[in-house]
């Protein structure tokens, strides 16, 4: 009997690890609470070179409030605030994009299109500001909440989005960006209107977005009726980017089936890492939380 104990244990481990993946609790219940402070609600998130750590930004507007922080899922205290590197603080940071090919370097963008190229030192937990630039023709009436840097071979592109509302569609823009020039410029190539079917009220069609390994664009659509909710979020595959002869184009999905639904949270931050999607919330007065989907579960 003893000689069969080890194979049985291994079999049970494999069964529990893989055979029961679909028996996980609904994703809407699998939140890890970050904070109940309004100041720490999360509006953008990106991975770092340490797989349990994520850089996040906050949409704060007042002096003395944090703009950026680090989530460490392996630590006892999940969140640590970081100092912004300059006295002049950004206003209303809404999204954070990692820069492909550059470890721990990111673009943080505010709702008026002001962008900040920053670098994170994970040894000291310090942020350096490398450069600033602005999205062309940004500012009111646009309210930008999504930004991406895309890299294909030696060509670098940018995509950004106006969130939209009940009365207007979101607008997804894309073009090329001269990221390594002394003065960074973005050349708009095209744009498209995005209108998702749900949520139904206080709608933000695109509150954040990221691209997966198949060039599919994922986006969060939220219901944001006020600082105390109630909130709802749906995650959609909006469409896909194509790259040909150094040109970038976007193909809108024919329909928008919901990929994930969060009945009580406002997901304003998401990042796609291979087979994993990380969601984080800006639940206003209700604080912030983080959630992870692996292989669609």
Language-model region placement:
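Bacterial Sec-dependent N-terminal signal peptides
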Residues: 1-30
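Sequence/structural signature of beta-propeller domains
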Residues: 20-297
């Amino acid at each position: 009997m003893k000689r069969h104990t080890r194979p049985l244990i291994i079999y049970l481990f494999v069964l529990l690890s893989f055979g029961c993946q679909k028996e996980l609790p609904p994703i809407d219940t699998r939140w890890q609470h970050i904070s109940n402070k309004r100041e720490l609600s999360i509006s953008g998130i990106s991975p770092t070179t340490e797989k349990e750590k994520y850089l996040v930004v906050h949409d704060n507007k007042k002096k003395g409030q944090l703009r950026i922080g680090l989530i460490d899922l392996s630590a006892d205290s999940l969140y640590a605030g970081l100092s912004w590197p300059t006295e002049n603080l950004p206003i209303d940071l809404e999204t954070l994009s990692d820069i492909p090919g550059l470890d721990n370097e990111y673009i943080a963008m505010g709702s008026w299109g002001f962008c900040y190229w920053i670098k994170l030192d994970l040894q000291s937990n310090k942020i350096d500001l490398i450069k600033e630039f602005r999205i062309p023709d940004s500012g009111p009436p646009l309210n930008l909440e999504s930004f991406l840097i895309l890299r294909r071979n030696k060509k670098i592109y940018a995509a950004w989005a106006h969130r939209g509302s009940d009365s207007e569609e979101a607008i997804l823009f894309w073009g090329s960006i001269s990221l390594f020039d002394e003065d960074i410029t973005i050349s708009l190539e095209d744009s498209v209107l995005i209108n998702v079917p749900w949520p139904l009220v206080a709608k933000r069609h695109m509150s954040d977005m990221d691209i997966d390994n198949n060039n599919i664009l994922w986006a969060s659509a939220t219901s944001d009726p006020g600082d105390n909710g109630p909130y709802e979020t749906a995650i959609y595959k909006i469409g896909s980017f194509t790259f040909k002869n150094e040109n970038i184009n976007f193909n809108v999905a024919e329909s928008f089936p919901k990929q994930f639904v969060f009945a009580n949270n406002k997901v304003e931050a998401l990042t796609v890492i291979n087979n994993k999607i990380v969601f984080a919330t800006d639940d206003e007065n209700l604080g912030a939380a983080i959630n992870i989907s692996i292989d669609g579960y």
